[in-house]
Amino acid sequence: MAYSIYVIELKKEVLKHRKFKEANPNYIPGKPCVYVGYTSKTPEDRYEKHKAGTMISAKYAKKYGFRLKPRLYRVHNPMSSRKEALAMEKEKARRLRNRGYGVWQN
């Protein structure tokens, strides 16, 4: 089974949530806010599930997500294991935070 990471751009309104702001103390105003995840589906399929509300643990992606950002994840996909995808999800989130992005991941 192949796995992928994906990045969903979030509307800036997500910044009004205390938990999101606390998770991103080095956020640079004007930089994108994103949700980073991994999946055994295609990133497009997973995005549709988020928007349909079937991903309970990803409320920010459902409420504030408005598009995929393939240029931020395409180079990493596909991966051969869940473990590899989870590690890459964490690494991608770390890298984006280091660039001043607002990032949410579960």
PLM-predicted stretches and their roles:
Residues K41-E44, E48, M55-N106:
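Aromatic/basic micro-patches that form nucleic-acid/chromatin recognition or nuclease catalytic surfaces
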Residues M1-E48, S80-K90:
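GIY-YIG nuclease catalytic motif and its immediate N-terminal context
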